[in-house]
């Protein structure tokens, strides 16, 4: 080609060489094989595009944190309210005439089945022990029931009894923080239910969780009874 004096040939060869260079730019050899060069097919990412997403992530994170804080605050407030209601229920006496009115404000703890009819204790030489109120049995008998409920497996303890008496899980967790949860459960149940808090109802709940030993303690006749 160097000895060819024809400029047209030289120019033609130069154009062909330029076309070959363009073809080689579109194909890149990798390990002996040719692969298309796609680096120039997509425009480069504009600078600062990734930095625009950071405020969005920060806003989402702040929303999640505020939601968690609000949830924790609500749980603490609800637990504190339940503790206050439980403390008020302890002070309710059996003969308080306003007990039934306050019972409507404390339904958060116990949900009594509507089918249960109030059992009125019969008077006479042979009263029906099943209709006797729990708070009317002797103090020593109550303490023995509470002691037995604190012993044994949790599935047959006071927690399971609370579920059969209509208490929700949150109320059971609140009572678990007390030093004597079995005492708190039975006293609160007796105060909330009033004339429905009979030995028959309690014995049925105890039998449902397999605590016949506690049922025997309640069924055993006492030498003397006293109103607590």
UniProtKB/Swiss-Prot annotation:
Membrane topology term = Single-pass type III membrane protein
Regions of this protein lying in the Cytoplasmic compartment: 74-228
The record's Gene Ontology cellular component field reads: lamellipodium; membrane; nuclear envelope lumen; nucleus; plasma membrane
According to the record, glycans are attached at 4, 37
User: Where, subcellularly, is it found?
Assistant: Cell membrane; Nucleus
Q: Where is this region: Disordered?
A: 87-122
Expression by tissue = Detected in lung and testis.
**Top-level division of the source organism's lineage:** Eukaryota
| Classification via InterPro entries | DEATH-like_dom_sf, Death_dom, Neurotrophin_rcpt-DD, TNFR16_TM
- Enumerate the spans annotated as Death domain: 143-222
Q: Name one GO biological process term.
A: apoptotic process
What's one Pfam family the UniProt record gives for this protein? Death
- Give the compositionally biased regions (Basic and acidic residues): 90-105
Membrane-spanning segments: 53-73
- Summarize the protein's role: Modulates NTRK1 signaling. Can activate several intracellular signaling pathways, leading to activation of JUN. Promotes apoptosis. Promotes translocation of SORT1 to the cell membrane, and thereby hinders lysosomal degradation of SOTR1 and promotes its interaction with NGFR.
Name of the protein this chain belongs to? Death domain-containing membrane protein NRADD
